[in-house]
């Protein structure tokens, strides 16, 4: 189908509101995307007419809710082209998915003297769990450095691997720079050395199709709320042969097969043994609606529109005097910048006065801020509902701020 940004915008109620007397320009989707009516309505309908506890009842509502939840598991598997629905674990989000792998697979497979490789551009969620694991077991955390343009120093990467490398944990798309990493080559290199690969897909799944089998990764994680879905729900994909060997890291209801005070506890099958307690079923229903929504629009069509918009935005922003852009020319989703020597918080506050929402701060990427020797950056993120007119308003706002602040 032909992509129409006007039709897409009509599906998002919040885009009709004003902020500080100005029409809202929402350029913070990389932090959390807005929700279409289809997602809002699906979750509301579930709570109005179909809510019940799943996997716990023989009555009709429970059976229906369970079937709907498991249908979304299959939908997520199809979305990622996983081998089966049983390779999909529902988690609270990308952060929990990474922590699950670190505390389950990591505790069993990483030991003293081993090493894990990450990159300098990672979000804290793909740094801190590995730091914690390395501290627990006496392993080493190795870091792929960046070039000045925000791409990986690929010539350094082979030298970081050795026979004790257990994992490469790498983002697909940087949440600050928009850098799209060459996953196929990195995954192949890691596997040559016997290491597993976890991909942080939080900033990727909304921008292009993802095929985990084609990538060959061992783990892949993403959050629904960046994919136009609800907060509090995400997906961990794990290859079946790995997931079947992993122990649960949280205990409680649903994740057990049997519990005995004298003989101990046995675990449920994967993936359910990783889903302790009552799940966020409403969020799962909303995730399913979000997957349906973007799939019907077509991620290839979305990618084409967004890349055209990105080129327009970069060209327009390069014309703003004193504007410092960070990241490579070819990027996805985000544009990080500073305006001269003015603090990012000041610039972001002025933009908010003009009805323009951008993110300011370290973006949960403090090592990356240190790499560029700045305390903070502004970040404008472009989603499928943004327009060239909104880019023009951002540019005009920055021009105005420059005149006001000097």
From Swiss-Prot:
One of its GO terms (molecular function) is selenocysteine lyase activity. One of its GO terms (cellular component) is cytoplasm. Its EC number is 2.8.1.7, 4.4.1.16. Keywords: Cytoplasm, Lyase, Pyridoxal phosphate, Transferase. Gene3D superfamilies: Aspartate Aminotransferase, domain 1, Type I PLP-dependent aspartate aminotransferase-like (Major domain). Pathway: Cofactor biosynthesis; iron-sulfur cluster biosynthesis. One of its GO terms (biological process) is cysteine metabolic process. This is Cysteine desulfurase. It comes from Klebsiella pneumoniae subsp. pneumoniae (strain ATCC 700721 / MGH 78578). The gene is sufS.
């Amino acid at each position: 189908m032909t992509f129409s940004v006007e039709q897409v915008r009509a599906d998002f109620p919040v885009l009709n509101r004003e902020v500080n007397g100005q029409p809202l320009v929402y350029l913070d989707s990389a932090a959390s995307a807005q929700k279409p009516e289809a997602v809002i309505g699906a979750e509301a309908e579930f709570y109005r007419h179909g809510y019940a506890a799943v996997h716990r009842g023989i009555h009709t509502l429970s059976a229906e809710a369970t079937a709907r939840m498991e249908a979304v598991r299959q939908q997520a598997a199809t979305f990622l082209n996983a081998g089966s629905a049983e390779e999909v674990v529902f988690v609270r989000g990308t952060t929990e998915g990474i922590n699950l792998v670190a505390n389950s697979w990591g505790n069993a497979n990483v030991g003293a003297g081993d090493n894990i490789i990450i990159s300098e551009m990672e979000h804290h969620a793909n740094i801190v769990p590995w730091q914690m694991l390395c501290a627990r077991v006496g392993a080493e955390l190795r870091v792929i450095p960046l070039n000045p343009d925000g791409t990986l120093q690929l010539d350094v990467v082979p030298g970081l691997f050795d026979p004790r490398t257990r994992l490469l944990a790498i983002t697909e798309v940087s949440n600050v720079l928009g850098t799209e990493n060459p996953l196929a080559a990195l995954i192949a290199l890691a596997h040559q050395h016997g290491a597993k690969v976890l991909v942080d897909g939080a900033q990727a799944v909304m921008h292009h199709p993802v095929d985990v089998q084609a990538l060959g990764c061992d783990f892949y994680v993403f959050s629904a709320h960046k994919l136009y879905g609800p907060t509090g729900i995400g997906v961990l994909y794990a290859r079946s042969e790995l997931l079947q060997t992993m122990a649960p890291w949280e205990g409680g209801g649903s994740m057990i097969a049997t519990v005995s005070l004298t003989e101990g506890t046995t675990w449920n099958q994967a993936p359910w043994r990783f889903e302790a307690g009552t799940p966020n079923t409403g969020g799962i229903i909303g995730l399913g609606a979000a997957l349906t929504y973007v799939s019907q629009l077509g991620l290839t069509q979305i990618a084409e529109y967004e890349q055209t918009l990105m080129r327009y935005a970069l060209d327009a922003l390069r014309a703003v005097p004193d504007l410092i852009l960070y990241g490579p020319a070819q990027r996805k989703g985000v544009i990080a910048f500073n305006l001269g020597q003015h603090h990012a918080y000041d610039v972001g506050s002025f933009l908010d006065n003009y009805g323009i929402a951008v993110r300011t701060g370290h973006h949960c990427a403090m090592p990356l801020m240190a790499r560029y020797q700045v305390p903070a950056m502004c970040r404008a993120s472009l989603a499928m509902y943004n327009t060239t007119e909104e880019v023009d308003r951002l540019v005009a706002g920055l021009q105005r701020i420059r005149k006001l602040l000097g």
